[in-house]
A protein has these predicted regions:
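Hydrophobic/aromatic-rich alpha-helical bundle segments in the mid-to-C-terminal region
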Residues: 4-8, 122, 126-129, 148-160
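Charged, amphipathic alpha-helical coiled-coil/dimerization segments
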Residues: 26, 77-140
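N-terminal helix-turn-helix DNA-binding core of bacterial DNA-binding proteins
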Residues: 27-67, 81, 152-154
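Short helix-coil-helix linker/hinge
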Residues: 36-42, 70, 101, 126-128
Length: 200
């Protein structure tokens, strides 16, 4: 069988790009959130609790795509930093939930708009159609990766339950995460925060 060198180069280039984009994205996010004394991991945990309320560590691990052990260590560090607290259920002491402290709330609230501004800045280079196509393509790649980790997973069900099929994702974010009036200011052209992309 003849090897299609051009196609194999494309496959290799795409795989390298996926890895490098992921690594660079985390570096950029760390730079954005470091101004608020947070890491990307801490920001993700705090925004999840802010959006959904107190959660069990196992639920946080599932939502943030982490192992139970790594989630436990992250929570330990954030408890020591005073950002979150663990609370045992009074009726069932085996059940523990993680909630945000006042310090955590104070720290994360200004970081959320900064993160949203960063997302818009990075993706502004793509047209609306390109953004939709990229999202659909990445969903397919994610589905294959999940299937690799769990051969018993139903890929059709994974795609059906993906974020891209949630029509209220943006509305929930505006309601639960962004400060009142922020989106009106942003869409009117009043940017919040300074650019970080140009410095990387």
């Amino acid at each position: 069988m003849t090897v299609n060198v051009e196609q194999e180069n494309t496959v290799l280039r795409l795989w390298l790009l996926l890895r490098r984009v992921g690594d660079t994205l985390v570096r950029c996010q760390d730079l954005v959130f470091s101004k608020y004394g947070l890491t990307t991991e801490q920001w993700g945990l705090l925004t999840t609790i802010k959006s959904r309320g107190p959660l069990r560590p196992s639920d946080l691990a599932d939502l943030l795509n982490r192992t139970p052990n790594s989630m436990s260590m992250l929570i330990d560090r954030m408890v020591k930093a005073g950002l979150v607290r663990r609370t045992r259920n009074r009726k069932d002491r085996r059940v523990v939930t993680v909630s945000m402290t006042e310090k955590g709330k104070t720290v994360v609230e200004p970081a959320i708009p900064a993160g949203w501004e960063f997302i818009h800045e990075v993706l502004s280079t793509l047209s609306d159609d390109e953004q939709r196509d990229l999202a659909d393509t990445l969903e397919k790649v994610k589905c294959e990766l999940v299937g690799y980790l769990d051969p018993e997973a139903d890929k059709v069900e994974i795609l059906k339950n993906s974020l891209s099929n949630d029509p209220d994702l943006y509305k929930r974010m505006v309601k639960n995460l962004l400060p009142p009036g922020y989106e009106a200011k942003r869409t009117a052209g009043k940017r919040v925060g300074k650019s970080v992309v140009g410095r990387l």
